[in-house]
Amino acid sequence: MISGLLGIPERQISSTLHLLGEGATIPFISRYRKEATGGLNEVQIENIKEQHDKLCDIARRKETILSTINEQGKLTPELEKRINATWNPTELEDIYLPYKPKRKTRAEAARQKGLEPLAMIMMLQREPNLTAKAATFVKGDVKDTEDALKGARDIIAEQVNENECARNAIRNQFTRQAEITAKVVKGKEEEAAKYRDYFDFSESLKRCTSHRLLAIRRAESEGLLKVSISPDDEACLERLDRQFVHGNNECSHQVKEATADAYKRLLKPSIETEFAAQSKEKADDEAIRVFTENLRQLLLSPPLGQKR
């Protein structure tokens, strides 16, 4: 797998990992074990180590996920096969999301009130008299018909948020259309003077350069800028409606409302957090690359400056 990612033959990767496992440092391997690694340089060895560490982290995460789902009695052979087959951390977490232990959510509170059957009826979008059907759920902690419908919508919203196809669709919208927006925190204008270029900034995320991302994130961490990443909300809602809303009746109107709530309250913030982390990683990687190149040039320059 590492060989495919880095384009380095498996034999060289195995030898490198063996040396790292014995405690050899990257500079030592690069300089004194060229015959074992096939002449890999420090950057290549570092990349091998980094990818190996990531895969080890994913393997440990899989063990935790499999154990948790198994304890719930919900681990089927098909689910176990899917989890074992994926090495994409985002996909892994999407698979796990419906089984992930949650603090008491609005959906869980609604389930405890006995409203999951109503949510299932609404999702089918076939019930001709939803109001009358909802009235049959008014008992115990369910105060009235609207309370029943609201609880059912909360359950549907959570289902939409946990749907892998929906999450990937919104990720795709973020990838293609998301804009990063920065605004100065009110009252911080003077303190944030060096970030003036970003006081009212908006640009396509995929076109935003690494040095801009780095500056924006630095200012955000200093409490000087408010930063958000957002796609075209209407396009996202239309995409979700195509997946979940069928027909034009009382049930479909309720599902449409639940889908909009899922996007605004759950899905969008979750995917925005993912893309914020990715943009920070991109900026950090570029900063390290620039620093490394500058240091290399410095070390290669004559000790007393250029000869005249």
Predicted feature locations:
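C-terminal interaction appendages of subunits in large macromolecular complexes
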Residues: 1-12, 63
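Helix-turn-helix-type domain boundary/helix-start signal
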Residues: 4-6, 38, 73
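N-terminal cofactor/phosphate-binding cores enriched in small/glycine residues
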Residues: 8-43
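Acidic, Mg2+-coordinating catalytic module of metal-dependent nucleases/exonucleases
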Residues: 13, 48-51
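Duplex nucleic acid-engaging cores and interfaces of nucleic-acid transaction enzymes
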Residues: 28, 44-47, 54, 58-68, ...
